[in-house]
């Protein structure tokens, strides 16, 4: 459950380390984002010589949340931290590698490129 002002880790090698959600896309009154949703983020911490720098405003896909994700079979999955992957306007990842596991729910949201780059799909 991601809302405005939420800080997230970046799960790719785009150069950003931490980002902050500044808008949840998908309707004027939408308050929360979950796994697979697209948000607008501001880069708060970045590594030197990365593709992005501190202060950049980007779009990102939420890939992990500390809030439970309930599945159709009744099982629940949750992660230790909130994480996102930076994407361009065509919803393609900016980085070339994804770090950490990603949930299967991204497949239903048409983020196949992120799933193919991820080392583990839960």
Curated annotation (Swiss-Prot):
SMART domains listed in its UniProt record: Ribosomal_L14 (SM01374)
Sequence similarity: Belongs to the universal ribosomal protein uL14 family.
Organism for this UniProt entry: Bartonella tribocorum (strain CIP 105476 / IBS 506)
UniProt-listed GO biological process terms: translation
Assigned keywords, A-Z: Ribonucleoprotein, Ribosomal protein, RNA-binding, rRNA-binding
Protein name as catalogued: Large ribosomal subunit protein uL14
Superkingdom, taxonomy of origin: Bacteria
Subunit structure: Part of the 50S ribosomal subunit. Forms a cluster with proteins L3 and L19. In the 70S ribosome, L14 and L19 interact and together make contacts with the 16S rRNA in bridges B5 and B8.
CDD domains: Ribosomal_uL14
Record InterPro entries: Ribosomal_uL14 (IPR000218), Ribosomal_uL14_bac-type (IPR005745), Ribosomal_uL14_CS (IPR019972), Ribosomal_uL14_sf (IPR036853)
GO CC entries: cytosolic large ribosomal subunit
Gene name of the encoded protein: rplN
A Pfam family matched in the record: Ribosomal_L14
Role description: Binds to 23S rRNA. Forms part of two intersubunit bridges in the 70S ribosome.
HAMAP family membership: Ribosomal_uL14
GO molecular function: large ribosomal subunit rRNA binding; structural constituent of ribosome
């Amino acid at each position: 459950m991601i809302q405005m002002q939420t800080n997230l880790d970046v799960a790719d090698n785009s150069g950003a380390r931490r980002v902050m959600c500044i808008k949840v896309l998908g309707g004027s009154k939408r308050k929360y984002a979950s796994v697979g949703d697209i948000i607008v983020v501001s880069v708060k911490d970045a590594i030197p010589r990365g593709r992005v720098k501190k202060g950049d405003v980007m779009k990102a896909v939420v890939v992990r949340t500390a809030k439970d994700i309930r599945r159709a079979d009744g099982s629940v999955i949750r992660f230790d931290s909130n994480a996102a992957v930076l994407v361009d306007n065509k919803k393609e990842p900016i980085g070339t590698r994804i770090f950490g596991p990603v949930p299967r729910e991204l497949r239903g949201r048409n983020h196949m490129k992120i799933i193919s780059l991820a080392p583990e799909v839960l």
